[in-house]
Curated annotation (Swiss-Prot):
Description of how the protein assembles with itself and partners: Homooctamer; the c-ring consists of eight c subunits forming a circle, and each subunit adopts a hairpin shape. Component of the ATP synthase complex composed at least of ATP5F1A/subunit alpha, ATP5F1B/subunit beta, ATP5MC1/subunit c (homooctomer), MT-ATP6/subunit a, MT-ATP8/subunit 8, ATP5ME/subunit e, ATP5MF/subunit f, ATP5MG/subunit g, ATP5MK/subunit k, ATP5MJ/subunit j, ATP5F1C/subunit gamma, ATP5F1D/subunit delta, ATP5F1E/subunit epsilon, ATP5PF/subunit F6, ATP5PB/subunit b, ATP5PD/subunit d, ATP5PO/subunit OSCP.
Major location (coarse): mitochondrion
Cross-referenced InterPro entries: ATP_synth_F0_csu (IPR000454), ATP_synth_F0_csu_DDCD_BS (IPR020537), ATP_synth_F0_csu_sf (IPR038662), ATPase_proteolipid_c-like_dom (IPR002379), F/V-ATP_Csub_sf (IPR035921)
Transit peptide, start-end: 1-61
Family matches, as SUPFAM superfamilies: F1F0 ATP synthase subunit C (SSF81333)
Name under which the protein is recorded: ATP synthase F(0) complex subunit C1, mitochondrial
GO biological process terms held by the UniProt record: cellular response to L-glutamate; cold acclimation; negative regulation of mitochondrial membrane potential; negative regulation of reactive oxygen species biosynthetic process; pore complex assembly; positive regulation of axon extension; proton motive force-driven ATP synthesis; proton transmembrane transport
Spans through the membrane: 77-97, 112-132
Linked pathology: This protein is the major protein stored in the storage bodies of animals or humans affected with ceroid lipofuscinosis (Batten disease).
Amino acid sequence: MQTTKALLISPVLIRSCTRGLIRPVSASLLSRPEAPSKKPSCCSSPLQVARREFQTSVISRDIDTAAKFIGAGAATVGVAGSGAGIGTVFGSLIIGYARNPSLKQQLFSYAILGFALSEAMGLFCLMVAFLILFAM
């Protein structure tokens, strides 16, 4: 059974470890001195590991930026699908009108509806791409 004295952390120990806790992981790994120096044993504490999870390094930010661009590019592919859909709708309108010219008004109404739905999906994909780029 541990005593209360063993569980308490002294203020001197906290002050000596604060510098190591604030530095990001990449900075502490890259700036290691070649000669061994006296460091307190608190640097391998679980508190330090928990604190370093919130630090971001340059590599982590670069990975996040690359992921943003990849996600935005994937979302932009839907705009090409919208263009293909619009072409299909109006191509079908021309074929339908050539087969039965008396249905001109009804075919045109359906073509406009198909155009609107296809364009809405393209704009939705573009909106998602902009949200990925600028809102995250």
